[in-house]
Amino acid sequence: MTPFEEILAVRAAEAGLALTAAQIEQFAVYNRLLIAWNERMNLTALTAPEDVAVKHIIDSLTAYDAKLFAPARTLIDVGTGAGLPGIPLAVYAPKIEVTLMDALGKRVKFLTEAAAAMELRNVRCIHARAEEAARRPEHRARYDIAVSRAVARLPVLLAYTLPFVRTGGTLLALKGRAYAAEQAEGKRAAEILGGGAISARPVRLPGLDDVRAILAVTKERPTPKGYPRRTGLPERAPLK
């Protein structure tokens, strides 16, 4: 094993994650490509082996919930950036078809190369803005699960993501230590966009003291036709 693979194996075990040797090898491929591409473009500020293993990969996998993922068939990662949390979830839940969506073409090129090198046959990469893609019939209300990490505060994030989720599906937002404030802020937006109550599942990462959380919103009814609003408006004028 390489030093990165050893760190990942140890930290994953500490987090209660059962990674296979093949999955660890896939993540090693991702790590190598992330480091190489990061020299050409700004994908992440965190490139040390411990940081990639814990703050990127294991953090992404905290979104996994067996009861939710077992029956799911489709997942979209909105504003995926460097493929987080979508790529780790695609590795860990290979039966789910994962769509990685990002507005920056260069990042989509990285994602496409990474998915191919990791032999992730359950991943497709799309270059699009969420506000525009969510109005297309092939994406609107088509996904069992939507995930997002480090994109926007919850009222804005809900506007970007809930239109993609089918009725009965779930949005999972990976949030930091201020998650309780965002949970309260997002209540009205969730109601407007067809979501139910916002639940919080606190999580801890191995080796770190801070508490994070997965905020979950179940889609209870269709998102009104007027949403998402035109490009840029969800962020400039969040729903309150």
Regions found by a protein language model. Give the residues of each.
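Conserved SAM/SAH cofactor-binding pocket of Class I
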Residues: 58-152, 158-161
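Short strand-turn motif at the edge of the Rossmann-like AdoMet-binding core
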Residues: 103, 151, 174-178, 202
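Class I SAM-dependent transferase core
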Residues: 1-76, 106-123, 231
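Short alpha-helix immediately C-terminal to the canonical SAM-binding loop
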Residues: 107-109, 179, 183
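Conserved beta-strand segments of alpha/beta enzyme cores
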Residues: 97, 122-124, 170, 196-199
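Short loop/edge segments at beta-strand edges and connector loops
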Residues: 21, 47, 127-129, 199-201
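Short glycine-dipeptide loop
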Residues: 165-172
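SAM/dcSAM-binding transferase cores
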Residues: 184-240
